[in-house]
Amino acid sequence: MLALDARAEVDRIVDTLRKQVLGTLRRRGVVVGLSGGIDSSVVATLCTRAFGKDKVLGLFMPERDSSGDSLRLGRRVAAQLGIENILEDIGPAVEAVGAYRRQLEAIRTVVPDYGDGWKCKLVIEPVLESNGLNITRLTVQDPEGKVDTVRLSPAAYLQIVAATNYKQRLRKMTEYYHADRLKYAVAGTPNRLEYDQGFFVKQGDGTADVMPIVHLYKTQVYQLAEYLGVDEEIRQRPPTTDTFSMAQSQEEFYFALPYHLMDLCLYGLNHGIASDEVAAVAGLTEPQLQKVYKDIDAKRRAAHYLHARPLLSVEIGED
């Protein structure tokens, strides 16, 4: 259902990137944030094919909650591609804007003892086990390793998300600094599942000049990764958010189903495929599939704000 001709797709994307960056945008090359994940690795590889290794800048932008694997694998990608790369520790900037403090304040409204040595992450209930409500909870781990999960108030949840969103926005500011000084374009890394479902930060990782893989389902990104020779450890690494201090999968935090099932359901919904056929391929019952479809529609409604352009008091006709 999601199989593609990887060679033809790579050739098409590379050709499009050249036309967009060199022609439409009149930039000399591209900046890519390297997270050590599958999406940024594929985008960096595509950009290197399009512009050559001397016209691609890879950025590593860790902070104190980042996994060490992200930097290690990101460096491996840059080394294999032979591209210029820079380490930008955004931790001091995250600290300076008060992101850690604001997150801590919100957490302490539900876990008063939370402090040094503790770790946390946000989690949602798997959609197939839920009653239809996407309720986010906070999981914490104390210095002795004891784990507990508590329900958040709406205000605490929103403040935690708002505070952590600083990280993505500071990374994007850093990307644009280097893009401006080099006269480069910023390449975004969202795939179709993430972009459709709103799994990005407005004016953060959802912002870019070009988005080479935004039309591809996550499953298809993995197909390109294999064709392009992306490092096997990266291809085998489970998708993570790398946002909170506790290790966290994307399905724990947002999608509530493994990406390959979300892809199948989203593809089926987008292409009007009969629900019984989609359910059979995904290994779901019809009621389970309808739960997934309901979740997809709910996230699409929530993502409308993230995709929206600024609203003008008077429409301007000029482009």
Swiss-Prot record:
An example Gene Ontology molecular-function term: NAD+ synthase (glutamine-hydrolyzing) activity
Keyword NAD: yes
Record protein name field: NH(3)-dependent NAD(+) synthetase
Keyword check for Metal-binding: yes
The family this protein is said to belong to: Belongs to the NAD synthetase family.
Catalytic EC class: ligase
E.C. no: 6.3.1.5
Recorded metabolic or biological pathway in which this protein acts: Cofactor biosynthesis; NAD(+) biosynthesis; NAD(+) from deamido-NAD(+) (ammonia route): step 1/1
Superkingdom assignment: Bacteria
BP GO annotations: NAD biosynthetic process
Residues annotated as binding ATP: G33, L34, S35, G36, G37, I38, D39, S40, T189, K218, T240
Entry-linked NCBIfam families: nadE, PRK00876.1
Reactions catalysed, as given in the entry: deamido-NAD(+) + NH4(+) + ATP = AMP + diphosphate + NAD(+) + H(+)
Subunit record text: Homodimer.
Upper taxonomic lineage: Bacteria, Pseudomonadati, Pseudomonadota, Alphaproteobacteria, Hyphomicrobiales
Encoding gene, per UniProt annotation: nadE
GO cellular component term, pick one: cytoplasm
Entry keyword set: ATP-binding, Ligase, Magnesium, Metal-binding, NAD, Nucleotide-binding
Sites where the protein binds deamido-NAD(+): R169, K202, D209
Entries under InterPro entries matching the protein: NAD/GMP_synthase, NAD_synthase, NH(3)-dep_NAD(+)_synth, Rossmann-like_a/b/a_fold
Residues where Mg(2+) binds: D39, E194
